[in-house]
């Protein structure tokens, strides 16, 4: 981080802003270079809808990081890079946390994730399909979908900017400026693992710049990421059930000794968790694989007009763990079948089971527009954008208890889809004024149309079906403590049915 120099005392230019469904913009920001104490510098603040303004009384907390700054960080995930460079940028790995295992919610200054405005090339970034229902109930863009190789610089306004941008920017603004090189390129391969010997990660990133005619460019960036799972959990030992014989709580509850001392159960425990780790309930990062591409292009039509476009596509797959289901926990219960016999889910999972939660995430965006200036000094930027995010879930190594013996072991519980379409026009012009100001008046205005769509898609029927065992005594064997005709018939066939036993 550069030292923040003292600032020369200056008078702020006066500006008048007129908002007509005011579109979001993001003015460039620059740091003064590192200097000795006492050197007078000026900075350009981020947060103007028109041209940049200088400030003098006090520096607004704006951080600007170059591509070299990003490359100097040992991480390759853009989220982790920002977490390293920006102290107020917070995020963490969230094992066994629903969709947050696959799309990590990030925030500035400890505020909810949807209070940070994320921009790419000064255009609003679409939000991910994940709503953090287990936390703040908010929805934010997935910053991990932006490859670090595609970023030319990052501007972070670490202060509230809601007066300028609305409630989206209460915590601040992050603006990713994409590379615009028309030649050259880069390629890097990073690999490593944790000291525990797991979690091996390999990331391949690259960028290439190509000319587009005589006055244009196409900058193409790509990333491939692969990571093995980690496990930092210990063998399961809760207040109701304990798997670890070395734990002081082992066999403290006599009711489960019938399982822990059963050779069939003991033989099944190593297979309860089909994922990474030698414990029944892993705690760590999921297996993950992702591939992404980001393209930025521009063409100078004439001295006053430029056409631009940029977009991305990313596909990722992750496989994490859920909580261990031990015998008789409400999921693995003995069930009376239609013939009066007993079905025990332990037939499928002798040592209990730990569900696997998989998430396939797709992210797509395209932005295009034209900007320039007219002869009368009016500057314009007219653009449109489309963004889509989709999360598709799979739940494996589990059962639907209500279906009994007929239950499959893998389910598709549903999809989440977020779509955004926006068209906007930004204008600004400098006006002469007789007012005692440090410069001309700036009039900025514009219009915006935004259409947002969120969809929760139901999964396969078996994932939510209430099967026959969703109710007690589904085959009407008992009338209170007395067998019915159907109950008497199965008892006569050798069933152990006992209507006087409320647990039967």
Which role fits each region the language model picked out?
Residues 123-158:
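Short acidic/polar hinge/loop motifs at secondary-structure boundaries
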């Amino acid at each position: 981080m550069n030292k923040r120099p003292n600032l020369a005392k200056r008078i702020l230019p006066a500006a008048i802003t007129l908002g007509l469904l005011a579109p979001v913009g993001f003015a460039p920001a620059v740091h003064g270079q590192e200097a000795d104490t006492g050197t007078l510098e000026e900075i350009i603040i981020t947060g103007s809808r028109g041209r940049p303004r200088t400030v003098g009384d006090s520096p607004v907390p704006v951080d600007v990081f170059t591509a070299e700054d990003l490359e100097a960080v040992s991480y390759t995930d853009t989220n982790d890079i920002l977490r390293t460079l920006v102290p107020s940028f917070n995020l963490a790995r969230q094992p066994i946390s629903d969709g947050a295992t696959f799309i990590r919610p990030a925030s500035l200054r400890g505020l909810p994730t949807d209070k940070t405005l994320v921009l790419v090339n000064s255009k609003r970034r679409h939000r991910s399909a994940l709503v953090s229902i287990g936390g703040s109930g908010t929805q934010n863009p997935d910053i991990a979908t932006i490859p670090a190789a595609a970023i030319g610089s990052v501007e972070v306004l670490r202060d509230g900017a809601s007066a300028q941008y609305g409630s989206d920017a209460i915590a601040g603004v992050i603006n990713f400026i994409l590379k615009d090189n028309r030649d050259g390129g880069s390629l890097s391969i990073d690999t490593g693992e944790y000291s525990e010997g797991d979690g091996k990660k390999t990331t391949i990133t690259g960028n290439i710049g190509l000319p587009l005619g005589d006055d244009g460019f196409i900058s193409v960036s790509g990333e491939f990421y692969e990571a093995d799972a980690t496990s930092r959990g210990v063998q399961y030992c809760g207040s109701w059930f304990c798997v670890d014989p070395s734990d002081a709580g082992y066999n403290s509850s006599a009711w489960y000794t019938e399982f822990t001392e059963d050779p069939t159960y003991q033989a099944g425990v190593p297979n309860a968790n089909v994922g990474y780790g030698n414990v029944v309930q892993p705690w760590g990062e999921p297996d993950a694989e992702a591939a992404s591409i980001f393209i930025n292009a521009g063409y100078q039509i004439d001295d006053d007009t430029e056409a631009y476009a940029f977009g991305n596509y990313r596909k990722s797959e992750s496989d994490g763990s859920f909580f261990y289901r031990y015998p008789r926990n409400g999921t693995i219960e003995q069930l009376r079948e239609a013939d009066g016999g007993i079905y025990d889910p332990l037939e499928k999972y002798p040592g209990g089971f730990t569900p696997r939660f998989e998430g396939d995430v797709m992210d797509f965006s395209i932005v295009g527009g034209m900007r320039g200036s007219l002869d009368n000094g009016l500057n314009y930027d007219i653009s449109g954008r489309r963004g889509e995010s989709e999360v598709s879930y799979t739940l494996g190594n589990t059962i639907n208890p209500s279906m009994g013996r007929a239950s499959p072991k893998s389910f598709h519980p549903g999809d989440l889809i977020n779509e955004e379409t926006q068209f906007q026009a930004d204008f600004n012009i400098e006006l002469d004024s007789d007012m005692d100001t440090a410069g001309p008046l700036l009039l900025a205005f514009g219009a915006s149309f935004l259409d947002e769509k969120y969809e929760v898609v139901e999964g396969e029927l078996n994932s939510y079906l209430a099967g026959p065992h969703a109710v007690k005594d589904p085959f009407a064997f008992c009338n209170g403590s007395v067998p019915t005709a159907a109950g008497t018939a199965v008892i006569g066939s050798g069933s152990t049915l006992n209507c006087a036993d409320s647990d039967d």
